Amino acid sequence: ILIDEATQATEPAALVPLVRGARQIVLIGDHRQLPPTVISQRAENGGLNRSLFERLAEMGIEPLLLRTQYRMHPAISAFPNGRFYDDLLEDGVTSEDRPTPAGLLWPDWDMPIAFLPVEGGEVKAPDGASKENPTEAAWIARLLEGLLDAGELRQQDIGIITPYAGQVRAIRDSVPERYDGVEVRTVDGYQGREKEVILFSC
């Protein structure tokens, strides 16, 4: 049995396909990325907030590490490689393979990462359970427009990620309908996916 994104499944969820038995189990995932989403505090307190993958790793079953990453520009991969993977990852792509996209005034053209501070504007979302920042959502819409107007990227090449469901709604409200091919999701909703450019609203 193969279970993909196994680190996002709680232990009980991962055990369901094993009920009838299996000679071999292959769990595919990364226990250094997002853990399973557990809404119930009681379930979390009961230890149901981790994956079978994580438990087996803690018990000493050594996961096999895929050492070459092909997704990110080397300047972007440097942080997670050093912080989470003890500098064990190698870049299978070069800066030339992942050129800096036109459409933004990059502080450093060779470093395709930019932080844009947006002052104020954070409020509770109308549902009361999340946060949103309409000012930041408007900035995201402007950045998106600049990237697409430059002509190098298609809508499908750009993703917008935010930790908050309320901010997902605020961004969708700010982005013109003509850009409905751009995916806007929460961090959990983007796990395992990739785009040429990610705009992160936090």
Can you describe what each PLM-predicted range is?
Residues 1-202:
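Conserved helicase motor core of SF1/SF2 NTP-dependent helicases
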